[in-house]
């Protein structure tokens, strides 16, 4: 049986741990609030650019652009969004397990059939250790990334599609549903075969021409899909970490309660033993 000193040390250690996890929970909650605002504020831009692209694509049958045209798929590109830090429950493991299974099933791990662009240190390390074909990576993104932070990697991913490095491009990330729920999501980025808007399209007059507008607008639209997924993923990351830290704090409090009960019982047993010894000594003197 553990001594009173050992139990007391465990109680103090667990209390310190619970204080750390509680602080991390509060920090994640604060970051989540801002991440939610970032994701929501970007939606109007995405909806408007989608509306304009849909207006051109649906209203002009003769327009031909490489980003709109499907071609035989010989190689597939994947963008995988993970985090740089852990302690976020299943945030990283869920999306990485999904991507790993998809690549094994679709490509049988043949590096000639797929390429991965990974965002996040944990995702990069996980995929590298297991021999997946990573062609580009980004680590060190802030908790609240700007469009500038992601533009270079998004532009490179789009350029590789245009150059024929792969024939389609998917993005995998954790979609933010609520503070306690995040879903691994697959979105097809390229080719842009589904740009129809749910809202009625507005008639626009384009200068100098619809073709020239598309040359500029389509890459921006594809980049916005990547950035929107990143913002969504960041909200999911903070929510997952907040939930994980709350669970850790709750578990720590349960351990403290159990250890406190054990401490009280051990102390009571020690006191009882001392009383018994005193009574026994007095009886021996009589």
From Swiss-Prot:
Gene3D superfamilies linked: 3.40.1380.10, ATP synthase, gamma subunit, helix hairpin domain
Family under the similarity heading: Belongs to the ATPase gamma chain family.
Primary location recorded for the protein, binned into one broad class: membrane
Protein's recorded name: ATP synthase gamma chain
Function: Produces ATP from ADP in the presence of a proton gradient across the membrane. The gamma chain is believed to be important in regulating ATPase activity and the flow of protons through the CF(0) complex.
Entry-linked PANTHER family: ATP SYNTHASE GAMMA CHAIN, ATP SYNTHASE SUBUNIT GAMMA, MITOCHONDRIAL
One Pfam family hit: ATP-synt
Sequence intervals crossing the membrane: none
Gene (UniProt): atpG
Species per Swiss-Prot/TrEMBL record: Bacillus mycoides (strain KBAB4)
Localization: Cell membrane
Entry-linked NCBIfam families: ATPsyn_F1gamma
Domain of life: Bacteria
């Amino acid at each position: 049986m553990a001594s009173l000193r050992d139990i007391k040390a465990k109680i103090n250690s667990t209390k310190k741990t619970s204080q750390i996890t509680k602080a991390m929970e509060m920090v994640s909650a604060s970051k989540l609030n801002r991440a939610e605002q970032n994701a929501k504020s970007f939606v109007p831009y995405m909806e408007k650019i989608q509306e304009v692209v849909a207006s051109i694509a649906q209203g002009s049958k003769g327009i031909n652009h490489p980003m709109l045209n499907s071609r035989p798929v010989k190689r597939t590109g994947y963008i995988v969004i993970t985090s740089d830090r852990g302690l976020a429950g299943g945030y990283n493991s869920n999306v990485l397990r999904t991507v790993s299974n998809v690549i094994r099933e679709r490509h049988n791990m043949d590096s000639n059939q797929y390429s991965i662009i990974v965002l996040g240190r944990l995702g990069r390390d996980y995929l590298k250790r297991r021999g997946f074909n990573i062609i580009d990576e980004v680590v060190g993104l802030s908790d609240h990334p700007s469009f500038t932070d992601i533009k270079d990697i998004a532009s490179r991913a789009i350029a590789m599609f245009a150059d024929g490095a792969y024939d389609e491009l998917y993005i995998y990330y954790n979609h933010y549903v609520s503070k306690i729920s995040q879903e691994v999501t697959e979105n097809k980025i390229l080719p842009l075969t589904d740009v129809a808007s749910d809202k009625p399209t507005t008639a626009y007059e384009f200068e100098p021409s619809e073709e020239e507008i598309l040359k500029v607008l389509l890459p921006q639209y594809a980049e916005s899909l990547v950035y929107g997924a990143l913002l969504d993923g960041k909200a999911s990351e903070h929510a997952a970490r907040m939930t994980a830290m709350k669970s850790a704090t709750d578990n720590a409090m349960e351990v403290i309660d159990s250890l406190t009960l054990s401490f009280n019982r051990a102390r009571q047993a020690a006191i009882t033993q001392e009383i018994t010894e005193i009574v026994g000594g007095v009886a021996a003197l009589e």
